[in-house]
Amino acid sequence: MNPANYLYLSVLLFTIGASGVLLRRNAIVMFMCVELMLNAVNLAFVTFARMHGHLDAQMIAFFTMVVAACEVVVGLAIIMTIFRTRKSASVDDANLLKG
């Protein structure tokens, strides 16, 4: 398979994720779209690494996945806390930061 096809797929996944972040108001859906964007960037990194024969981009993709896993833990904890206090996962309700 041509490496350009992987790059096209990466652009498509990133576009879907960006449109989800911009159009949706649910925090969980927005969070999943951000993760989709990170995976699209990882796919592009791995594709470029494969095209040029270097392992540097694959290491960057691996560390990005590690950071994304940590982000999932912290992000879901914040979303669950907001959901418990506000009874809604809407981003519009999260701008009220009073305790």
From Swiss-Prot:
Signal peptide range: none
Keywords: Cell membrane, Membrane, NAD, Quinone, Translocase, Transmembrane, Transmembrane helix, Transport
Keyword Transmembrane helix: yes
Catalytic reactions on record: a quinone + NADH + 5 H(+)(in) = a quinol + NAD(+) + 4 H(+)(out)
BP-aspect Gene Ontology terms: ATP synthesis coupled electron transport
PANTHER family tied to this protein: NADH DEHYDROGENASE SUBUNIT 4L-RELATED (PTHR11434:SF21), NADH-UBIQUINONE OXIDOREDUCTASE SUBUNIT ND4L (PTHR11434)
Protein name: NADH-quinone oxidoreductase subunit K
Top-level taxonomy: Bacteria, Bacillati, Actinomycetota, Actinomycetes, Mycobacteriales
Gene: nuoK
